[in-house]
UniProtKB/Swiss-Prot annotation:
Annotated Zn(2+) 2 binding sites: 269, 271, 296, 299
Oligomeric form and interacting partners: Component of the PEX2-PEX10-PEX12 retrotranslocation channel.
Keywords: Membrane, Metal-binding, Peroxisome, Peroxisome biogenesis, Protein transport, Transferase, Transmembrane, Transmembrane helix, Transport, Ubl conjugation pathway, Zinc, Zinc-finger
Any one GO biological process: protein import into peroxisome matrix
Organism, scientific name: Caenorhabditis elegans
Name used for this protein in its record: Peroxisome biogenesis factor 10
Gene3D superfamilies in UniProt: Zinc/RING finger domain, C3HC4 (zinc finger) (3.30.40.10)
Length: 314
């Protein structure tokens, strides 16, 4: 059978179809886990259900050497680069781990690090004392926040832009493992290729502008902070006060997802979660192509990320 290099449109349609099936598996896992394990356990495991569903889906297809349902839909076949050979088992296993498990593990480790940093009893982090050094504590928190909200999303956007321009490696995991797609169809949609390439360049320009704005905002904020510190020193006779350790957590509140008592935030329905958990849940839900809103993990009320209200005086 003759095979051809898969085009961008075919790969995108295949991935969208796979994402639809993964969403369906996630919904089924959610219903089953809620009925069997109870609501409290379900709430705690809800953020991980999509990664579990993705791991199960790709293990039963890619690892076993089968086509995914999306690949069957558009007649695509996985290949070791453009050599027209089946990817090796280690490559397929590595793809599943990088694509499904690595984001979950990295996000979990970052959350645990942030939880450790925000706890007032933590003496040191990575060998650096932070118990009485609130500046170092806040610097670590800023770094992890930047990794989670800036670096990882920007890298994903840059990779998608490169995919639109070159037509190779839809996901970062496929780029690392060298797995590409071959197609059984010989047709070529030149106008669509031009549109995708245009979108790629627009995305890169948007990314560059976003990075420039972020850098400018950071420099302006640093300038403002330095000015504020100088004014405080003048007003306080040269003394510099440390932040109150207890300002980092709230002993009367506990997030029902991560069970931490930090940064309480409320939804319209009245349920409380920590800012990190509910924002990540909302962003993950709204980033899916199948839905435009998230749902409260407890009562399933629809909401947008902008509807989350931080409670600063709890």
């Amino acid at each position: 059978m003759n095979t051809y290099v898969a085009e961008i449109g075919e790969i995108v349609r295949s991935q969208r179809r796979d994402e639809e099936y993964i969403e369906d598996i996630t919904e089924r896992l959610s219903r089953v886990s809620k009925e069997l394990l109870g609501q409290r356990t379900w709430i705690r495991w809800f953020p991980y259900l999509k990664s579990i569903a993705s791991t199960l889906y790709y293990t039963s297809t890619v690892v076993l050497g089968n086509q995914t349902l999306g690949e069957e839909y558009v007649h695509l076949f996985e290949s070791n680069g453009l050599e027209r050979t089946v990817p090796s088992i280690p490559s397929r296993i590595s793809f599943v781990l990088l694509h499904s498990a690595f984001p979950l593990i990295s996000n979990y480790l970052i959350q645990k690090a942030e939880s450790t940093l925000t706890h007032p009893s933590t003496e040191s982090f990575l060998g650096i004392p932070i118990r009485k050094n609130q500046k170092a504590r806040q610097s670590f928190l800023d770094v992890f926040f930047w990794l989670r909200t800036k670096l990882f999303p920007q890298l994903q956007r840059a990779h998608i832009a490169l995919f639109y321009i070159t037509g190779a490696y839809y996901s970062i995991a496929r780029r690392f493992t060298g797995i590409r797609f071959l197609s059984a169809s010989a047709h070529s949609d030149i106008p669509a290729l031009k549109v995708y390439r245009f979108l790629g360049y627009i995305t890169l320009i948007q990314l560059a502008v976003s990075i420039g704005i972020s850098l400018y905002s950071f420099l302006e904020q640093e300038k403002f902070n330095n000015k504020l510190k100088k004014e405080k020193k003048e007003n306080n006779g040269g003394s510099d006060r440390n932040l109150d350790e207890n300002s980092l957590f709230h002993p009367t509140f506990q997030c029902s997802i991560c069970l931490e008592n930090k940064n309480p935030s409320a939804l319209f329905c009245g349920h409380l979660f920590c800012w990190t958990c509910i924002q990540e849940h909302a962003v993950a839900a709204t980033s899916s192509a199948s839905t435009s809103s998230a749902r409260c993990p407890q009562c399933r009320l629809e909401f947008q990320p902008r509807d989350v209200t931080p409670l600063l005086n709890l």
